[in-house]
From Swiss-Prot:
Gene encoding the protein: abitram
InterPro entries found in the cross-reference section: Abitram (IPR039169), Single_hybrid_motif (IPR011053)
Name by which UniProt lists this protein: Protein Abitram
Family: Belongs to the ABITRAM family.
GO CC, alphabetical: nucleus
Function: May regulate actin polymerization.
C-alpha cells in the first residue's frame, strides 16, 4: 500500500464493451473505498485527457440531486449506462461519461463545472466525476464491464506505477 488511493480503495476500470474499435478507449475508473462508496472518474487511457476541454455539463437530475441523513435518502438512482455528464472539447468533440455501476448518486464534483481543466490535471484525485453508493456492494465485480486494476493495465498496455514504499508498508505480500 502506497498512495491514498492504493491504500484505501479497490481500483476497477469500466471498459465500454459496445465500442468495437480497439483504438477507441473511452474507459472510466471506479474506485471502491473501504466504506463501500465508489468514486467515478476518467481513466488514464480516455482520449479526453489528450484534448483541450472547453466545458463540462452535468445532467440536470445530477446537479439537482440532494441526499440527506445517515441513510442518504433521496439520491438519484443510476443504471450503469446513465449519463452523468457531457464533456465538450475545443474541437467540438463530445464525450458522454456514464455512471458505470448501478447505484445511488450521492454527489457530483461541481468544481468541474467552473474549472474543467481540473479533469485533465488531477483526473485520478480531485478531478473525479461523482460519488456513488453501489447497489451491488459485496460482489462489486459483478457489475458488468468492470475489470481489475492489473487487468486494465495489461489490456491497455500501460505500465503499473506504484507510489513510494514506506517501512511500515512493507509486508510479505507486496513487492
Amino acid at each position: 500500500m502506497r498512495t491514498l488511493i492504493e491504500r484505501y480503495y479497490s481500483q476497477y476500470y469500466f471498459i465500454d464493451t459496445t465500442i468495437t474499435d480497439p483504438n477507441l478507449t473511452e474507459d472510466q475508473y471506479v474506485n471502491q473505498h473501504t466504506n463501500e462508496l465508489a468514486v467515478i472518474g476518467v481513466a488514464p487511457s480516455h482520449p479526453v485527457l489528450q484534448q483541450e476541454i472547453s466545458k463540462i455539463e452535468f445532467k440536470e437530475n445530477a446537479i439537482n440531486n440532494e441526499v440527506s441523513g445517515v441513510r442518504k435518502t433521496g439520491g438519484f438512482k443510476l443504471q450503469s449506462n446513465t449519463i452523468l455528464c457531457v464533456i465538450t472539447c475545443s474541437n467540438g468533440k463530445e464525450y458522454f461519461l456514464r455512471s458505470c455501476i448501478k447505484g445511488k448518486l450521492l454527489e457530483i464534483n461541481k468544481e468541474l463545472i467552473n474549472n474543467p481543466s481540473l479533469l485533465k490535471t488531477n483526473h485520478a484525485t480531485s478531478g473525479f466525476l461523482a460519488i456513488v453508493e453501489p447497489m451491488i456492494k459485496d460482489k462489486f465485480m459483478e457489475n458488468p464491464g468492470l475489470i481489475k486494476f492489473e487487468e486494465y493495465h495489461k489490456l491497455r498496455n500501460i505500465p503499473i506505477q506504484k507510489g513510494p514504499v514506506f517501512l511500515k508498508d512493507n509486508t510479505n505480500d507486496e513487492d
